[in-house]
A protein has these predicted regions:
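Active-site acidic/histidine proton-transfer and metal-coordination neighborhood
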Residues: 53, 72-179
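Residue-level detector of anion-binding/catalytic polar loops
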Residues: 28-29, 57, 99, 146, ...
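Catalytic domains of carbohydrate-active enzymes, especially glycoside hydrolases
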Residues: 17-35, 96-100
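Glycine-rich, proline-tolerant flexible connector loops at the mouths of alpha/beta enzymes
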Residues: 31-52, 108-109
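Active-site-proximal loop/turn and secondary-structure-junction residues that shape catalytic pockets
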Residues: 9-11, 34-36, 64-67, 106-108, ...
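Conserved beta-strand positions in the central sheet of alpha/beta enzyme cores
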Residues: 31, 60, 101-102, 148, ...
């Protein structure tokens, strides 16, 4: 396993500055969360030169915008705007050899599903989402890029909260560029046993997001990190583990500390 960190967590006015900080702090990879409105040829050129300039590899790429999370919206215009943005991210990943992720929906849920967890897609919803997933996968077919499903907690998505629910869709599409992106923070709200869920997901797991139970850096909440990393080792996971959480203070201090904490788990 190798360490990775999400770009919004890292100080720096440019991708290059962020990557150089990460290189100094013990992270060989970066996940790029790129504001869609700020995307242009100059930023693209910087992204594609990043590894050569800094030694830090961009392994995940997502566009961020207020339209994010609406790929299955009932609003035709909003749905198409979101899908166009997702398709653009997938095309970047096809050229870069990186992973991107999608989900059925993303955003605050109203009404909040406090006492009605694990809601399931009906047959029409499932079929429509699978059709969209296959459309996204076709954009990266034949490349090293991946389009992954990330299980989100019930307060951010009404459906597909469990790793197993997402795994069933990955199995149905049966595409070599598909896979899972479990996030330990989301899992802490939905899974009764994180390690067991990871073991069951097995080789469907392509990328991992890390955040503790309070979405702080690993080791600053309630999660049993030794059992999580033991499970990843048992399934033979050798990919990237990416921090996607609060920096819990000054990142120049806390991110190097987190790298040491995670490295000890990886090598234990």
């Amino acid at each position: 396993m190798q360490l990775c960190c999400s770009s919004p967590m890292v100080p720096g006015a440019t991708l290059t500055a962020k990557a150089r900080n990460l290189q100094a702090w013990g992270y060989p990879a970066i996940a790029i969360f790129q504001p869609y409105a700020e995307w242009n040829q100059s930023v693209r050129d910087e992204l594609f030169a990043l590894e050569g300039r800094t030694g830090v590899r961009p392994v995940e790429f997502v566009f961020t915008d207020e339209i994010y999370g609406n790929a299955m919206s009932a609003d035709d215009d909003l749905r198409e705007q979101c899908r166009a943005m997702y398709r653009a991210a997938a095309q970047v990943c096809a050229d870069l050899g990186a992973a991107t992720e999608i989900e059925y929906q993303y955003g605050p849920q109203n009404p909040m599903p406090l006492f009605d967890p694990y809601q399931q897609l009906d047959s029409g919803q499932r079929a429509s989402f699978i059709d969209f997933y296959r459309e996204m996968l076709a954009l990266v077919e034949g490349t090293k890029a991946r389009v992954l499903l990330e299980p989100l907690n019930r307060y951010e998505s009404r459906y597909l909260n469990l790793v197993a629910d997402n795994a069933s869709i990955v199995d149905e599409v049966a595409h070599p560029n598909a896979g899972l992106l479990p996030d330990t923070f989301h899992m802490s709200l939905e899974e009764s046993d994180l390690a067991a869920a990871l073991r069951t997901a097995g080789d469907r797991i392509v990328h991992v997001h890390l955040g503790d139970s309070n979405r702080l850096l690993p080791g600053r909440g309630l999660l049993d990190w030794a059992s999580i990393f033991d499970a990843l080792k048992e399934i033979g996971y050798t990919g990237f583990v990416n921090l996607e959480c609060s920096t819990s203070g000054d990142p120049a201090v806390t991110l190097p500390e987190a790298a040491r904490f995670l490295h000890a788990l990886i090598t234990a």
